[in-house]
Swiss-Prot record:
Domain of life (superkingdom): Eukaryota
Family the entry assigns: Belongs to the formicidae venom precursor-01 superfamily.
Function: Venom protein with unknown function. Does not induce paralysis when a high dose is administered by intrathoracic injection into the blowfly Lucilia caesar.
Disulfide bonding pattern of the chain: 40-49
A GO cellular component entry from the record: extracellular region
Residues cleaved off as propeptide: 27-36
This protein's name: U7-myrmicitoxin-Tb1a
Tissue spec. comment: Expressed by the venom gland.
Key words, A-Z: Disulfide bond, Secreted, Signal, Toxin
UniProt-recorded Gene Ontology molecular function terms: toxin activity
Localization annotation: Secreted
Signal sequence annotation: 1-26
InterPro entries xref list: Pilosulin
Length: 54
């Protein structure tokens, strides 16, 4: 395999990693919000759960 093909492959992997990373972070934040809602269902009187619909 030529060196240019290897460089192209690494460049594509690098770009796809950069594109995919924000989606992973958004999913992690959504999971944290879901966990907070579950905790508010279990502990509805907790001060942080005021105004959260169960």
């Amino acid at each position: 395999m030529q060196l240019s093909h290897l460089l192209l492959a690494f460049a594509m992997i690098f770009v796809m990693t950069i594109i995919h990373t924000p989606q992973v972070q958004a999913d992690a934040m959504a999971d944290a919000d879901a966990d907070a809602a579950i905790n508010c269902r279990r502990y509805p009187r907790h001060p942080k759960c005021r105004g959260v619909s169960a």
